[in-house]
Amino acid sequence: MGKIAFVFSGQGDQYPGMGKELSEKYPVAASVYAMCDGIRPGTSAQCFEGTVEELKETKNTQPCLFATELAATSVLKDKGVLPDAVAGFSLGEVVAATVCGIFDNETGFRLVCKRGELMQREAEKFDTSMAAVVKLTPEQVVEICERYSDVYPVNFNCPGQITVSGLSSQMTDFFSDVKAAG
C-alpha cells in the first residue's frame, strides 16, 4: 500500500447529524464523543441533533467538527489505518496536531473549545460578514477590497478561492463589485 495522509477540514464542513452513525456503529468513536461531552457537555447532542443555525455558531462549530474528525480518525486507527502524514486547514490544523500527538485528545479539544468561544465573542462585537470569493485572481480581490475601508482578504485558501471579511454595511457593495469583475 502507498502512503496515507489524513487531511482535516476547517469550519464550513459541518452538518446536522454528523458523526451520529459513526458513534452508534463504532465504540471507539462513541468514546471520543463521551470524552468531549465530559469536557463540554452537549457536544455530541449538537453534532447528532443540532440545527444548521446552531452548527453555524463558531462556538459550536469548532468543538463539533473537532469531535467528529477525531472520532472518524479513531475508527481508522482502530482498524489499523495509520497516517504517514497529517495536514489540516484552520481548525483542521489543530485536529492534525492532535492526531499526530502534539496535543493529547483532551488538550486539543479544550483548545478548540476556547478558540471557538473567543472567535464567537469577537465576531459578535461588530456587524460583519465573510464569504469566499471564487474565480477572481488574488490581485483582483485585493484591488476590490482596497476600495473599502473595512473589507479585507483574510485567507488565500487555494488557487481561485479567497476568503474576504468586513463590515456588513460595506460587503453588499463589495459583492456587487465582485460580480461586476467576473
Residue ranges and their predicted role:
Residues S9, Q14-P16, E21, G92, ...:
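Short, electropositive, low-hydrophobicity segments enriched in small/polar residues
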Residues G2-A87, V164:
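Helix-rich "cap/lid" substructures immediately adjacent to catalytic or cofactor-binding pockets
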Residues M1-G2, L82, F126, C158:
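Residue-level preference for short coil/turn positions at secondary-structure junctions
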Residues L22, C36, A96, I144-C145:
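Broad structural signal for hydrophobic residues in well-ordered alpha-helices, predominantly aliphatic
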Residues M18-E21, K25, G50-T51, T58, ...:
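Surface-exposed loop/turn and secondary-structure junction residues enriched for glycine/proline
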Residues Q11-G12, G38-P41, C100-G182:
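Alpha/beta catalytic cores of group-transfer enzymes, especially the acyltransferase/condensing modules
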Residues Q62-A132:
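Gly/Ser-rich oxyanion-binding loop with an adjacent helix/lid
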